[in-house]
Amino acid sequence: SNEDKTELIYARRELHKICDGKRVDDIQWPIDISNSSGLSFLTYLQASAHFYSENWDQADKSYKEIKNASDPWIREVTSYMIGRNKLKETWNLALGKWGNFKGQTFIKKEPLLEANQAFNSYLSRYPNGQYASSAQGLLRRLIWLSGDKEGLAREYIRLLNTDEFPSATKVTLVKEIDQKLLPLPKSLS
């Protein structure tokens, strides 16, 4: 209904306040959404609020609650966000006080594996989806976070040998290789 749309638009506008430090519990969420599609959108907004608040468990629970929603966009975006949420959980635990990467020893393996599984599931279901390119790049980050330099080197070789990227993007990729991979693993040097 038009009332549902208005309520959901308002709720979406409230979401940016999370980035300004507002707590999820302080947001006035609509309470009278009348249809299942609208409820799925509301749950997506709430899950995203938890994601941006770094409440990984609640975000995961909420995204999974709507992963089979009737709306095709909700199904696709939640499939992607389940992986992104697990990646952020893993990444944040490995950051130091000043945002520096503390190293592979600080990586939690379970969310890393769950993120990998979620992104691969997303890509098998939506190989040309709206978030396919991002999911592919985030899988590359997961390979790096796992410490698999040989796997990362194979992925970089695959990317450099494809026509997926324009030349300008390959320059950025070469810089990434310099930062993440060098020195080369002994088996590849």
Question: PLM ranges: what are they?
Answer:
Residues 1-189:
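Acidic, polar-rich low-complexity tracts and alpha-helical solenoid repeat scaffolds
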